C-alpha cells in the first residue's frame, strides 16, 4: 500500500488539473497563436508562469485504484500488475483468462 498522503496528493493534483484545464489550454493557445500580438503572448506567458505547477497535467502520475501503487500500472484496468494478477487468478476480472496454447 502506498502512503495515504501520496494518494491524497495525487488526488489533489487531479482536481487542480481538472479545474484549471480550460484556462491553461486557452493561455497555451494564445502563446502558440500566430495572429496574436507579442504583448498579448507575453501576458499569457506570465499568466501561465504564475499558475500553480500542480495544475499542469504533466505532473500527474497514474496510480492503482486499489493500492495506490505508482509503478506497474495497467491503463486498461486502472490497477497495478500485482492486483491484476491476483484478481485475474480469482476470476474477478470479466473476460480475462489464463493463456494456454
UniProtKB/Swiss-Prot annotation:
Keywords: Ribonucleoprotein, Ribosomal protein, RNA-binding, rRNA-binding. One of its GO terms (molecular function) is rRNA binding. SUPFAM superfamilies: Glucocorticoid receptor-like (DNA-binding domain). InterPro entries: Ribosomal_uS14, Ribosomal_uS14_bac/plastid, Ribosomal_uS14_CS. GO terms for cellular component: cytoplasm; small ribosomal subunit. The keyword Amino-acid biosynthesis does not apply. Binds 16S rRNA, required for the assembly of 30S particles and may also be responsible for determining the conformation of the 16S rRNA at the A site. Belongs to the universal ribosomal protein uS14 family. This is Small ribosomal subunit protein uS14. It comes from Chlamydia pneumoniae (Chlamydophila pneumoniae).
